[in-house]
């Protein structure tokens, strides 16, 4: 038995390693080198152009960004390499329904730009936990949410992107997995540590263009190869692997036959893999957390020149979010047509032979298209696309995570830290994240058998709804208080962890081997669980809040929707804490700073510490709370919202 397994594994290794020969040519390597040169050049330009020597400059780009790089960065930060692998893989397995996770985001982007960002800007905050501290007071909400956000970054974004990026690295370059990941993370960290948010956004913009151009070219090649859209819809329904029996297993035909509703977004509420009530009501809840509360996304909006630029960026990203169906999901489905025996394999021994994984090879759908369908030169372009999506997503996570650590956690440890110390701490924390990311790789490799999209969305459904509930109530119900918010989060955390730990312990199962997790815990689809969890948390928040003392309005001006336009002075709930730990006491180090040598000055220039000051400039302070718009541009934004909603309505009407 052991010898058989080793033979199968070696066969898979040789089969996969042979694909790396496809990219060992001057044309592909030249394209990849050019990609790295261009991205590094843009990163260096952004480092030199922008102010990185203040907290506002490093973490919020001095609130000087225009709409188009912001919109491109929102898209690039969201679309990691996990999307190319995960969306294409799930599309190959079950059809277009998975695109709902992407296309429904347009509505939440509008909610972000028109409702949440104005509140965040008027609150004058840099991080989402900081908003909760201003809104509710106390420290426990801010600290808890910061730690939870960092935990989610590691188990969701970083793990999914590194895993999916590793698939391309292994297939295309034949490099040692850990060496390749170390190189990528090192380059990614250089942008984040030295350049700040402005550098991240500008490199994101370049990488978004590369992603869109490359994935569009691959889509065209894929549709030409399959014979057009009509031929594609017909052939997909007949894409059944040649080997459907073996390993002494009785395999149900539904495990390898394309689903009858493969070309519909809305599916059966009971038997559907993505049930339509979950699509309609569960996805908006997880999307509310991701698009309106997630530090990675909101931080990009907080750096806009004004609110009109923020709204325009959200609209641009909304249009771009309609593209994954055509650029990722459908190419994954075409890969099943072209490479049916590998992508749609169902017999475990056959899957091991093709890709080394016994539960399926759908995650290899997109990489197979890139390496087998694209000609020389374009293969290098597509690998650059994968590197771009991986690096843009990771730079975004690293920058936002360092912001959370510095603003919400480090200042609690070092209450009198100088501005220079805060900047250095934020940069060093990125290094800690890199080490954590590398240590997480073996865990990701062990869990690589399932469909990546369902893994990420399930985790979001277990941890995201309590956060969404707290922020929604915080903005729209001024009666909510700190006790209600805290206990709502605690109840939600316990419920979410019970479900998540149970699934990790028993496994999520597959078509061949259903999970043995008790039905009372795991019997409800994760999107339905998100709905239940969300409303339970809201009930707890409101119930506890109405049973305890309310927060006086003097502490809530411009922190909630009802008082968003209030002109009265706000007394922050943490005002006493601020006085106790005032800036004057923590600046003695900077005031008595000794002259620095040439080497230290060069290092400071590289890291943006050469003009370190302990306060934001007056312009930055005013910009942080300014939400004024010119009437003309406000009207232009509102008209574009109507156009986007019309396009989205047609999209859902056609594919639902």
UniProtKB/Swiss-Prot annotation:
Q: Classify the source by domain of life.
A: Eukaryota
Q: Residue ranges, Extracellular compartment?
A: 48-64, 127-171, 230-270, 335-423, 477-526
The residue ranges crossing the membrane are 29-47, 65-85, 106-126, 172-191, 209-229, 271-291, 315-334, 424-443, 456-476, 527-547, 635-655
The Gene Ontology CC terms held by the record are: membrane; plasma membrane
| Membrane topology classification | Multi-pass membrane protein
Region annotation (Disordered) maps to 574-593
Q: Write out the GO MF terms.
A: D-glucose:sodium symporter activity; proton transmembrane transporter activity
Q: Summarize the activity regulation.
A: Not inhibited by phlorizin.
Keywords associated with the record: Cell membrane, Glycoprotein, Membrane, Transmembrane, Transmembrane helix
> Cross-referenced InterPro entries, in alphabetical order?
Na/Glc_symporter_sf, Na/solute_symporter, Na/solute_symporter_CS
Sites carrying sugar chains: 248
Asked if the keyword Acyltransferase belongs to this entry, the reply reads no
**Record note on what altering residue 457 to Q does:** Confers sodium-dependent sugar transport activity not found in the wild type protein
Q: Which family does it belong to?
A: Belongs to the sodium:solute symporter (SSF) (TC 2.A.21) family.
Protein purpose: Does not function as sodium/D-glucose symporter. Generates D-glucose-induced depolarization in a pH-dependent manner, with activity in acidic conditions (pH 5) but not neutral conditions.
What's the protein here called? Answer: Solute carrier family 5 member 4A
Source organism:
Mus musculus
């Amino acid at each position: 038995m052991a010898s058989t397994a080793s033979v199968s594994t070696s066969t898979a290794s040789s089969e996969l390693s042979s694909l790396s020969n496809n990219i060992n040519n001057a044309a592909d390597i030249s394209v990849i080198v050019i990609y790295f040169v261009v991205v590094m050049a843009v990163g260096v330009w952004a480092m030199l152009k922008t102010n990185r020597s203040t907290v506002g400059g490093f973490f919020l780009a001095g609130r000087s960004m225009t709409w188009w790089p912001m919109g491109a960065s929102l898209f690039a930060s969201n679309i990691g390499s996990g999307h190319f692998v995960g969306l294409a893989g799930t599309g190959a397995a079950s059809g277009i329904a998975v695109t709902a996770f992407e296309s429904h985001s347009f509505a939440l982007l509008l909610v972000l730009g028109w409702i949440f960002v104005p509140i965040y800007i008027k609150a004058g905050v840099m991080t989402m936990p900081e908003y909760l501290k201003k809104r509710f007071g106390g420290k426990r909400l801010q600290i808890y949410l910061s730690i939870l956000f960092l935990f989610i970054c590691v188990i969701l974004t970083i793990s999914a992107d590194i895993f999916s990026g590793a698939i391309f690295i292994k297939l295309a370059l034949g490099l040692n997995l850990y060496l390749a990941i170390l190189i990528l993370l090192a380059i990614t960290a250089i942008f984040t540590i030295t350049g700040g948010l402005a550098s991240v956004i500008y490199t994101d913009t370049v990488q978004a263009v590369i992603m869109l151009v490359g994935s569009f070219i691959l889509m065209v090649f894929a549709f030409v190869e399959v014979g057009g859209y009509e031929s594609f819809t017909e052939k997909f329904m007949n894409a059944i692997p040649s080997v459907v029996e073996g390993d002494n297993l009785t395999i149900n035909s539904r495990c390898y036959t394309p689903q009858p509703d493969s070309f519909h977004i809305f599916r059966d509420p009971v038997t559907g893999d993505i049930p339509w009530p979950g699509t309609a009501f569960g996805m908006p809840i997880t999307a509310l957390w991701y698009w309106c509360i997630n530090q990675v996304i909101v931080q990009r909006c907080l750096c806009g020149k004004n609110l009109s630029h923020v709204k325009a960026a959200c609209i641009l990203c909304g249009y771009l979010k309609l593209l994954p169906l055509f650029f990722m999901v459908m190419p994954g489905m075409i890969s099943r047509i072209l490479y049916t025996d590998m992508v749609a394999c169902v017999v475990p021994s056959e899957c091991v032979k093709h890709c080394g994984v016994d539960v399926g090879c759908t995650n290899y759908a997109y990489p197979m298209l890139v390496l087998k369908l694209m000609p020389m030169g374009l293969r290098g372009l597509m690998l650059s696309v994968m590197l771009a999506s991986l690096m843009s997503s990771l730079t975004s996570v690293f920058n936002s995570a360092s912001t959370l650590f510095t603003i919400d956690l480090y200042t609690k440890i070092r209450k009198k830290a100088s501005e220079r110390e805060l900047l250095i701490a934020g940069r060093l924390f990125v290094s800690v994240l890199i080490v954590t990311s590398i240590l997480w790789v073996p865990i990701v490799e062990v869990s690589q058998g399932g469909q990546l999209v369902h893994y990420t969305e399930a985790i979001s459904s277990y941890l995201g709804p309590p956060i969404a509930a707290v922020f929604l109530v915080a903005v729209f119900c001024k009666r909510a208080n700190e006790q209600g918010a805290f206990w709502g989060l605690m109840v939600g955390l316990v419920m979410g962890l019970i479900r998540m730990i149970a699934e990790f312990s028993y496994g999520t199962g597959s078509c061949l081997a259903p999970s043995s997790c008790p039905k009372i815990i795991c019997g409800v689809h994760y999107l339905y669980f998100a709905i239940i969890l969300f409303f339970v948390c809201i009930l707890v928040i409101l119930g506890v809040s109405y049973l305890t003392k309310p927060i006086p309005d003097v502490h809530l001006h411009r922190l909630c929707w009802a008082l968003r336009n209030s002109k009265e002075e706000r007394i922050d709930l943490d005002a006493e804490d601020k006085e106790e730990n005032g800036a004057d006491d923590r600046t003695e180090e900077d005031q008595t700073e000794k002259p620095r040598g040439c080497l230290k000055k060069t290092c400071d220039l590289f890291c943006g510490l050469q003009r370190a000051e302990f306060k934001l400039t007056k312009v930055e302070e005013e910009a942080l709370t300014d939400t004024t718009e010119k009437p003309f541009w406000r009207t232009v934004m509102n008209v574009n919202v109507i156009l986007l909603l019309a396009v989205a309505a047609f999209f859902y009407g056609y594919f639902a």
